[in-house]
Amino acid sequence: KVFGRCELAAAMKRHGLDNYRGYSLGNWVCAAKFESNFNSQATNRNTDGSTDYGVLQINSRWWCNDGRTPGSRNLCNIPCSALLSSDITATVNCAKKIVSDGNGMNAWVAWRNRCKGTDVHAWIRGCRL
């Protein structure tokens, strides 16, 4: 599913991401834009053999199990396929674990490069939340 900007913002808010660990909703929407273009079915293979999955491009080396990543830790205890659903519950629950891991949202390269230090509120402007 390719989410609309405000549609994804509303779903993320409903799942408790707004100000989770101090990151406003705009940060999460911005990250999703530049990680997946709001596409829940996005997958991208990495040079180390791992794959990133879903709207927040969660990585199979650490966070989920896709059955083909050597040495996968599966710290979210989920199949990576769960991260491709139009229901973002699994994605949000895993993202909460990732953002609590010590590096905050710096875990997302796209957030670090394209959202951090910018006016992220713009990503939820005009949304009825």
Curated annotation (Swiss-Prot):
SUPFAM superfamilies: Lysozyme-like. GO terms for cellular component: extracellular region. Keywords: Antimicrobial, Bacteriolytic enzyme, Disulfide bond, Glycosidase, Hydrolase, Secreted. It catalyses: Hydrolysis of (1->4)-beta-linkages between N-acetylmuramic acid and N-acetyl-D-glucosamine residues in a peptidoglycan and between N-acetyl-D-glucosamine residues in chitodextrins. The keyword Heme does not apply. The active site is at residues 35, 52. It is found in: Secreted. Residues 1-129 form the C-type lysozyme domain. Its main location: secreted. GO terms for biological process: defense response to Gram-negative bacterium; defense response to Gram-positive bacterium; killing of cells of another organism. PROSITE patterns: GLYCOSYL_HYDROL_F22_1, GLYCOSYL_HYDROL_F22_2. The keyword Secreted applies. Its EC number is 3.2.1.17. It comes from the Eukaryota. GO terms for molecular function: lysozyme activity. Pfam families: Lys (PF00062). Disulfide bonds join 6-127, 30-115, 64-80, 76-94. Lysozyme C is capable of both hydrolysis and transglycosylation; it also shows a slight esterase activity. It acts rapidly on both peptide-substituted and unsubstituted peptidoglycan, and slowly on chitin oligosaccharides. Monomer. Lysozymes have primarily a bacteriolytic function; those in tissues and body fluids are associated with the monocyte-macrophage system and enhance the activity of immunoagents. Belongs to the glycosyl hydrolase 22 family. This is Lysozyme C. It comes from Callipepla californica. The gene is LYZ.
